[in-house]
């Protein structure tokens, strides 16, 4: 640290060493000022231990008449002592600064301290120029002490001469230049602090305005997403119950869609990531709603049961997508996950994923909802002949069973079977179905006999079982029995 700054720091430390701090105010009382004059200024003040000297100094320094001396008032004393030492050193470099200064202070203490008080106050108001004056006083004080002491006389004179030469050569220009930048800096600091406080106040005032805007924007985005979701949700009346069940299995539903078709899931993932799991749950809800729009109450039960069989559904979707999803892919790309989930709903029933549910509930709700859904969807690929072949077994055994009822209800136009009395209507459907088959396959009496003989011999049972499996084979055996009855009836009616 330079010598000048060290002197300034010494002045500050001397004031703090004797001053008393009360709250935010640090000041010198009369007793503390007396101790400071006795210990620090005893070499330059006449009768420093005299109470009258202390009272006179306190009266001259105390501007606000508080009975204490603050730091800026203490700088007046420092400035006056420095000014007296500087005058003495300027007049005679060899003179004793202490003796001359003592005489001057003793003879006209009031006048000089008054002038020093005014000038020091001006310097104190100007800014940090006080420190420079105080440093010169400190240096002059050291010089005076060096002159009073024999061992340090040369050094003190050298120091004093250095100060004299510096002040004589540079005059007041450098001191003013040094003072003015610091004054400007202090003013800028105060302005900066004030501006900073103003900015903080403005910032604190502006933040509540920005936060609502941000929250409103966030709410707007969230509202847009929610509106999109709610727009999809309001397509059916029985949506709420179905969506509650499907929302618990959102993760499984997303896995099904990803395993079903990779090409369609690209658009679905881009659309679904913005809406997170909620949109997937809503989409799953749509799939279930669209699958069961014609039968509202039975569809809810079917969807609740099918949600427990999500694992098997994902596997079946891969198998059945190649066959029937081609037409649905072209139509369902605009609908993203909705059309896929609808197709997935149909495929689950076709592949027999509801077999366990059918065994538990029999023909209560699954046969109703499943039959009507399949009937309306499965006739599009044009596989009605296949369902006609499986249509003879009883209602309790066929959903691989529901498929048989679907074929019958689709071709004969009896959609009321699956919603009223499935067992009895299937029995009636067998009576209605056989003339339809006979009308398609029998051409004349000779062909009738041939077909009947083949049914008796079991050849048709063998060909059908190779295509349809064990369930279809059993149904063809029952058809053969029915054909014998028809044959006996026709033989009895021949002329």
UniProtKB/Swiss-Prot annotation:
Map out region (Disordered) in residue numbers: 96-439, 460-481
Please describe what this protein does. Promotes cell proliferation, G1/S cell cycle progression and induces expression of the cell cycle regulator CCND1. Regulates proliferation induced by pro-inflammatory cytokine response via activation of NFKB1 and PI3K/AKT signaling pathways.
Ranges of compositional bias, category Polar residues:
99-110, 152-194, 243-282, 290-303, 334-355, 403-420, 460-473
Q: Where is the composition biased (Basic and acidic residues)?
A: 196-222
Keyword Metal-binding recorded: yes
Q: In which tissues is it expressed?
A: Expressed in the basal skin layer (at protein level). Squamous epithelia cell-specific. Expressed in the esophagus (periphery of the cells of the granular and the upper spinous layers), foreskin (granular and lower cornified cells), scalp skin (granular layer), inner root sheath of the hair follicle and in primary keratinocytes (at protein level). Expressed in the squamous epithelium of the cervix, esophagus, foreskin and larynx. Expressed in the fetal bladder and scalp skin. Expressed at very low levels in the lung, kidney, uterus, skeletal muscle, heart and fetal brain.
Q: Which GO terms describe its cellular component?
A: cytoplasm; extracellular exosome; membrane
The keyword Cytoplasm is annotated on this UniProt entry: yes
Q: Name one GO molecular function term.
A: calcium ion binding
Q: Enumerate the UniProt keywords alphabetically.
A: Calcium, Cytoplasm, Disease variant, Metal-binding
* Binding annotation for Ca(2+): 62, 64, 66, 68, 73
State what protein this is by name: Cornulin
Instruction: Give the family per the record.
Output: Belongs to the S100-fused protein family.
Q: How does it assemble?
A: Homodimer.
Domain (EF-hand): give its ranges: 49-84
Name the major location.
cytoplasm
Highest classification ranks of the organism:
Eukaryota, Metazoa, Chordata, Craniata, Vertebrata
Gene from which this protein is expressed: CRNN
What disease is mentioned for this protein? Esophageal cancer: A malignancy of the esophagus. The most common types are esophageal squamous cell carcinoma and adenocarcinoma. Cancer of the esophagus remains a devastating disease because it is usually not detected until it has progressed to an advanced incurable stage. CRNN expression is increased in psoriasis patients suggesting a potential role in disease pathogenesis.
Provenance organism: Homo sapiens (Human)
